[in-house]
């Protein structure tokens, strides 16, 4: 059930009429990656890759969170974005 809601939430993000902030996008990215991949075990990007480094750090902050917990948090976060930006 949570997986279906997670997939539906991922689709809702695509239909937002206004662009969320960069911080909100990073949070979405981190929760999505934690829910779908698990803990970040990739190499940290170099100093000059600012975007990649920000995404890596956001995902790394989710380390230890279960897939189901990350999915539920993602769903709740998307609901807030829909209320704010739809």
From Swiss-Prot:
GO molecular function, one term: fatty-acyl-CoA binding
Pfam families: ACBP
Gene name for this UniProt entry: Acbp2
Family label: Belongs to the ACBP family.
InterPro entries: Acyl-CoA-binding_prot_CS (IPR022408), Acyl-CoA-binding_protein (IPR000582), Acyl-CoA-binding_sf (IPR035984), FERM/acyl-CoA-bd_prot_sf (IPR014352)
Top-level taxonomic group: Eukaryota
Tissue-wise expression: Expressed in larval and pupal brains. In adults, expressed in cardia, part of the Malpighian tubules, fat body, and gametes of both sexes.
CDD domains the UniProt entry points to: ACBP (cd00435)
Protein name: Acyl-CoA-binding protein homolog
Binding site for an acyl-CoA: 14, 29-33, 51, 55, 74
Residue stretches making up the ACB domain: 2-86
Gene Ontology BP annotations: fatty acid metabolic process; intracellular acyl-CoA homeostasis
């Amino acid at each position: 059930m949570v997986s279906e809601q997670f997939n539906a939430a991922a689709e809702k993000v695509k239909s937002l009429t206004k662009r969320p902030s960069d911080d909100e996008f990073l949070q979405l990215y981190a929760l999505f990656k934690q829910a779908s991949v698990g803990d970040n075990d990739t190499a940290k990007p170099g100093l000059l890759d600012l975007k990649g480094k920000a995404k890596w750090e956001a995902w790394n902050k989710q380390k230890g969170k279960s897939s189901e917990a990350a999915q539920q948090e993602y769903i709740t976060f998307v609901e807030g974005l829909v209320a704010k930006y739809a």
